[in-house]
């Protein structure tokens, strides 16, 4: 139990074992007398200590080696005997002393805040006694030890994903970005042709879906000559490609121009093929609706059957295949076979892949 050295000096005269047993075993009737005697002894000791303190304040910086040796001997004798003192005796002794006086620098009771200031109330190395022990460093708590251990550890690297389909691994301590998009940028305006725009066509027909679809059909028929223009443009580009390929001495410009023309031909042909496929699907859907109306009109059906998008695509492919010639069918089948074989080869392990 930590007790100041000043408190030890006051109760030093009554810490003999025989006297302490007598003090703890006496009845309550004798406590008043002993309390009075102890109070008188303590008052005398307080006066003596006050005189000693005044003398120490007058002669500041001068300490006797004999007094230090006596204090060390007394503290060594008192410390083992303090373990046998009961809490009741300590409470009575503290109540008899009254208020504690503020410890001076000579008793070693300097507050930790004032002790931190260098050169203020701190004894010089020459004034400090040779036998004085240094205070041990405060022990760290388990939480502080845990923090210190984690601070020394290097950051752990995240393992890679098990496969490309697995989710990305990210630490739970990853800081979320504080940047927020307050105002969205305005969308980039897209080029719209009013002749083929569905919004313009529906507005011109007062929102009627049937008339809007009819208007779109009429617009496609009215501007069907654009398809012929596209075909003519693709034919002209192919002629330019053939002339560049037959050229003997090609420059870097010719090579770049040839690559650009090939890309343009591929893009335009794909776009033309997409238009034809959509037109074929639209025709299939129109024919199916016409058949359903006839069946309902004849009374063979009560509700029409609506084709799904996948069924429309299948019927459009079958119709396009029937309209092809013999050579075109062979080419289409060969392209289909190569496409399926390429997909199967990708799923095949490397050891079984053989170049045909």
Curated annotation (Swiss-Prot):
Name assigned to this protein: rRNA biogenesis protein RRP36
Gene Ontology BP term (one): maturation of SSU-rRNA from tricistronic rRNA transcript (SSU-rRNA, 5.8S rRNA, LSU-rRNA)
Subunit structure: Associates with 90S and pre-40S pre-ribosomal particles.
UniProt KW keywords: Coiled coil, Nucleus, Ribonucleoprotein, Ribosome biogenesis, rRNA processing
Biased composition (Low complexity): 202-216
Family according to the record: Belongs to the RRP36 family.
Basic residues bias (residue ranges): 154-164
Taxonomic path: Eukaryota, Fungi, Dikarya, Ascomycota, Pezizomycotina
Source organism of the structure: Blastomyces gilchristii (strain SLH14081)
Coiled coil: 230-278
Matches recorded under Pfam families: RRP36
Gene that this sequence comes from: RRP36
Biased composition (Basic and acidic residues): 323-333, 341-356
Protein's UniProt keywords contain Nucleus: yes
